[in-house]
Every structure is written in structure tokens, then in C-alpha cells.
Amino acid sequence: LPDGEALQDEEVTLLQGVLGPAFQRGKLGDVGLQTIGQMVTDQKVALGRVVKGHKVGLTSKAMRERTGATEPDYGTIFDNWFVDEGSQVSMSTLNTPLVEIELSFVLGADLGGPTVNAVDVIRATEFILPPVEVVDSRFSKRGLPGVVDSICDAASCGFIIVGGNPVAPGDIDIRHVGGALYKNGVIEESGTAAAVMGNPINSVAWLARKLHEFGVHMEAGHTILSGSFIRAHPIA
């Protein structure tokens, strides 16, 4: 929860309803995870934050194997997480920062429902931008969080640096978009967008269907992070 914010009585009751049965079962389950994530979102919005999009993570086989996840994770993106290209970010504000490269879909129309497919994503997308995502867990423990922690924590989103040069989805073969991560002038890793569920369009469609299960949909103007096509690398 945001620093200094206490849970309201109704939120405590809601958490009890989620965590009590989860303790008995030994697992939270999707509904419990989404409930906690939505409570955090509601707290942030109450403090003046604005929902600016959603993200899906662990979309590559390499990242799922690294974290032990069986499916992608997901979370909400807020306005204060966007950083201008070329800006400096203080490391003192970060906990366990990692960096990823991926594609973001900026929507020109609402997107949601149980049957969203690749065609729906293409029709709803106004343009695509290349972002760098700084992944950062708000949990005190070091290393990559588990999928339970991650979903409760907005899929471990820290900051987003969105590049320029917007491209319409029909102007490129998205699967073949490549990227390389440099650190101090040395390539750490490179990859192509096809590593993201075969095509990042598929990950956005998956996310739209997943969010629909909890009554959430993507809105026109939202930025959707489709998932990294390389492993997450430490900044330091």
C-alpha cells in the first residue's frame, strides 16, 4: 500500500475474506491476487494517481522458467511511473532494479472482453512505441519476486521510459522487431519480439481476456506493456 496509508475497515474485512481461505488452502488463487492488486490500485487513485495502462510480464519462456511461473503475470500502470527519455532516475528510490526491453501498445479504442483476439488488438491499437522498463519489487527481499508477490505488486513495475518514433501496427512485422540491451557500451543480451508468446499482440490479447475475468478492461489512451523479449538484467 502507499506509504503512510492505513487500511479502512471494509478493506480489512475484504482482505480477511481473501487471506483466510487462502491460508487454509495454502494458496491465494487468481481472485485473491487480483483483489489485493485492485485494493492497491484503489488506494493509489484515492491519493491522486491516475491509471495510465496495464502491463503483462513473464511472457517469455526464459522468464517463466527463472521465476517458476506457469503463466504470465499482470498489473496496473500509473501516471507517475513514466519517465521522459534521457532523464535520470535516482537509485535511492529503487529497491531491486532490473531492466527489460519490450514493445508498448498505445490504444486508440477500448479493449476488453472474454473473446479478445489478435485482430481486436490490432484494431484497437493506435501506435506502438519501444519502451525500456525498470522492473522493481516493493517487497524488501532481494531478487526476483514470485508470481504471487508480483501480481499483488503491479507485476513489479518500477519506471517506464518510452521511446519516440511511434509506428502503426500495420506498418511493421511485429514478430521480427529486434532489440539489444547495452550496459556501459557492451551488449548484455539481444532478442526479438517473437519471444513474447510468438507475437506481442498475443500477449496483449491474453491480458485483455485475463482482466475481463475481474471486470477490468483497457481504455483508449492506455499504454499496454506487452512483455520483455529478453531476461531482466540488474541495473547496477
Question: Where are these predicted regions, by residue range?
Answer:
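Catalytic-core "active-site belt" of small-molecule-metabolizing enzymes
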Residues: 1-4, 15-22, 26-199
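Low-complexity, glycine/proline/serine-enriched flexible coil segments
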Residues: 10-13
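Residue-level recognition of short, solvent-exposed, well-ordered loop/turn junctions
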Residues: 35, 219, 235-236
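Buried hydrophobic packing segments
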Residues: 40, 162, 204-211
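Short glycine/threonine-rich loop-to-helix capping motif typified by GTGT followed
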Residues: 66-69, 230-236
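Extended mid-to-C-terminal alpha-helical interaction segments
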Residues: 211-215, 219
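Conserved metal-binding segment of the jelly-roll/cupin
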Residues: 218-231
